[in-house]
Amino acid sequence: MTCGFSTVGSGFGSRAFSCVSACGPRPGRCCITAAPYRGISCYRGLTGGFGSRSVCGGFRAGYCSRSFGYRSGGVGGLSPPCITTVSVNESLLTPLNLEIDPNAQCVKQEEKEQIKCLNNRFAAFIDKVRFLEQQNKLLETKLQFYQNRQCCESNLEPLFEGYIETLRREAECVEADSGRLSSELNHVQEVLEGYKKKYEEEVALRATAENEFVALKKDVDCAYIRKSDLEANSEALIQEIDFLRRLYEEEIRVLQANISDTSVIVKMDNSRGLNMDNIVAEIKAQYDDIASRSRAEAESWYRSKCEEIKATVIRHGETLRRTKEEINELNRLIQRLTAEVENAKCQNSKLEAAVTQAEQQGEVALNDARCKLAGLEEALQKAKQDMACLLKEYQEVMNSKLGLDIEIATYRRLLEGEEQRLCEGVGAVNVCVSSSRGGVVCGDLCVSGSRPVTGSVCSAPCSGNLAVSTGLCAPCGQLNTTCGGGSCSLGRC
């Protein structure tokens, strides 16, 4: 879009306007401010008592100041010595179609909100960085605590190893005691086997003695039967002797009676006379001798047999008593040894159970320690991962912060460069002012004591932007319109 404008020199304006009047401002300040907006300079704050359409024909003595961010300029001029009449320009009575962009203020407000949001984000990033630093310190503290805790818990392993070594030594002692008790048990079993053999021998001897006793008893019975037979024979012989005695006595009595009845006594010298008394006496003596000898022999034999049997019975009874005592003693010894063996077995089983329980407890404690160690290692790994994530986020935040710092530094350098450029001397400044209240015409403007600048008024509708430049025109709008005052003398807008 081309913007043509007419040059207005410093002169005197007239106050006699019908609809369009030019008025000089009161003695005071004339300030034009500008705020940068996407490469377009927007100037605000022009004070001077303008109407809807007014043209300033002259300025009283005053001054202007620069108080804008991107480019600004103050204008001032000398007041005319008197008011002269001017001719009325009918073209000035035509209302201007400014076509101001209504979204400019909204865009500025959005810019402010975006700047606020960026500031809030920057503050949030700073807070997040601080929070991440605190979290980093907390994680470092936790890591140090877990490392110290791991070191403390790692000291438990030698204790468990010492306890396991003690249990192993006790198990070895128990095994040695078990071997010793096994050897003693074998010795006791050998002694027991010897006693069992002796007991079996004694039982065999007892059976032999009982057999001998039975045989001797049979012999005694036979002797007693023989004694009974001999006694019966002796009685029979005694009865027979008595019978024969009575018989001989009766025969003698009969013979004596016969002899006494005979009155003739014959005396004969017969040497062959039979003496029955002597014969009977001799027979009786023989029988008595035989009976006494038989009785004596039977009694002596019976007595000897009885003595032998009694001695054998006494001897075997003593042997049996000693055997019974030995058997009882062996039974007591067997019971005692059995009790000792049972006690040793119980003690061995208890020790084995204690060793097994100790091994199980050691295994459980070792597994628990390993599980705790694995949990701590997992927690440490997780903490390392969390710390790595936090470090990554922290690095990202620091990168974002660095980018923001670079942008801020870049903006600062740009602003400082622009201020430095503004502080330095500038050339001719073209001012294009358009607002909703009308156009502004400034003649022979001065910027900070520099050479006069030429002001121009765009009669065509503009976007409402005020542009001040040295040899360049800012865009006047988005529409393809031209300023009706003529062509731009310093360049195209």
Curated annotation (Swiss-Prot):
Keyword Coiled coil tagged? yes
Q: Which GO terms describe its biological process?
A: intermediate filament organization; keratinization
Please list where the region (Coil 1A) is annotated: 112-146
IF rod domain boundaries: 111-422
**Which keywords annotate this record?**
Coiled coil, Intermediate filament, Isopeptide bond, Keratin, Ubl conjugation
Indicate whether Cell wall biogenesis/degradation appears among the record's keywords: no
The annotated crosslink position for Glycyl lysine isopeptide (Lys-Gly) (interchain with G-Cter in SUMO1) is 217
Q: Where is this region: Linker 1?
A: 147-156
Q: Where is this region: Tail?
A: 419-493
Annotated GO molecular function terms are: structural constituent of skin epidermis
Tell me which GO cellular component terms the UniProt record holds: keratin filament
- Looking at the record, which segments are called Head? 1-111
Other noteworthy facts = There are two types of hair/microfibrillar keratin, I (acidic) and II (neutral to basic).
What family does this belong to? Belongs to the intermediate filament family.
Q: Under which name does UniProt file this protein?
A: Keratin, type II cuticular Hb3
Protein source organism: Bos taurus (Bovine)
